Design a protein with these regions (language model features):
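Short loop segments and helix-boundary regions at transmembrane helix junctions
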Residues: 30-45, 49-122, 222-234, 252-255
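Cytosolic-side transmembrane-helix boundaries in multi-pass membrane proteins
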Residues: 256-295
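Transmembrane alpha-helical segments in multi-pass inner-membrane proteins
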Residues: 203-258
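Hydrophobic alpha-helical transmembrane segments
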Residues: 15-20, 68-73, 98-99, 145-150, ...
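Helix-loop-helix "hairpin" substructures at the membrane interface of multi-pass membrane proteins
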Residues: 141-217
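Small-residue-rich segments of transmembrane alpha-helices in multi-pass membrane proteins
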Residues: 47-55, 99-110, 183-188, 192-193, ...
């Protein structure tokens, strides 16, 4: 394994992009976990695919900004449809998410197949569009890193500025209402942050795995502490470390994709935490055993 890879420009560009993204998504993902909305990242990620393909079909270009804009628009449409179904029928929100993500991802795959076989789009370069499905950070360019940097900074800035409102909204909606916090606006803010992070991360991780980047670091953080601030710090560090190691492994070992490598490392850390962390399964079983012995 060639350690000198970490000094190469291409590695540094990809590593910076994935680490920034993983830190931001790890922090924001704690909200989805604590609010019981773990599927929302999956729904928005899958639903963004038709937006990306349609943006390419309309513009005829693979500009990252154009494709990200298409992903955000599709994510907004998916969110609105989920809300309409959940509030206007007896269908649960999780079920509505599953229906919408499946339908829109299927639409995206149909559109992708359509442009591949259509002479109208033969002149436009379609290479690299598949990276938005499965993720391939090797395609990340300096422009993409700048976009990820901007999105991550904006997302974290919004999170910090509205930290008090978000924290109260997450843990006690009744109290949030009594002190005048607008729950709808707070929910909308959280959704906007989540959507732009997902859209920015699709090229690196892919629509299929992007939700794992939101959820897995948050799961890890929640196993190690009850303090929300500490959970946020652990989630951010877990995301950054996993992104760096995943990028390094995929660069050093031929045939390893960056996105799946990052998610695999995140999952290993999360599994270890679920088993052995202070709030993990092993500690819980030991505490139960002590209580039984004490009786």
């Amino acid at each position: 394994m060639n350690i000198s890879i970490i000094t190469q420009y291409s590695f540094i560009v990809v590593a910076i992009g994935t680490m920034l993204l993983a830190m931001a998504t790890g922090i924001v993902g704690t909200i989805s976990i604590l609010k019981g909305q773990s599927l929302i990242g999956d729904a928005v990620g899958h639903a963004s695919l038709p937006g990306i393909i349609l943006a390419f079909m309309i513009s005829g270009r693979k500009s990252s900004l154009i494709l990200i804009f298409g992903a955000i628009v599709a994510g907004i449409v998916a969110f609105i449809l989920i809300q309409i179904i959940a509030e206007g029928s007896k269908i649960e929100a999780d079920t509505a998410m599953a229906v919408i993500l499946s339908a829109m991802f299927g639409m995206g795959m149909v559109l992708k197949s359509y442009i591949q076989g259509n002479p109208k789009y033969q002149g436009a370069s379609q290479s690299g569009l598949a990276s938005y499905i499965f993720g391939q950070a090797a395609y990340i360019l300096r422009e993409d890193v700048y976009i990820i940097l901007a999105v991550s900074v904006i997302s974290l800035a919004l999170f910090i500025v509205f930290y008090k409102e978000i924290k109260v909204y997450v843990f006690d909606m009744v109290y949030a209402y009594t002190i005048g916090i607008n729950s709808r606006l707070t929910s909308l803010l959280i959704m906007i942050i989540t959507m732009i992070l997902i859209a920015a991360g699709l090229k690196a991780v892919g629509a299929i795995l992007i939700s794992s980047m939101l959820i897995t670091p948050a799961v890890t953080g929640l196993q190690w502490s009850k303090s929300y601030k500490k959970v946020l710090m652990i989630a951010a560090v877990t995301g950054a470390v996993s992104a760096f190691l995943g990028t390094f492994i995929s660069s050093a070992v031929k045939g390893f994709s960056t996105g799946p490598s990052i998610i695999l490392i995140m999952s290993v850390i999360a599994l270890f935490s679920v088993l052995f962390a202070p709030r993990g399964i092993v500690r819980m079983l030991l505490n139960i055993r002590k209580m039984r012995v004490g009786k």
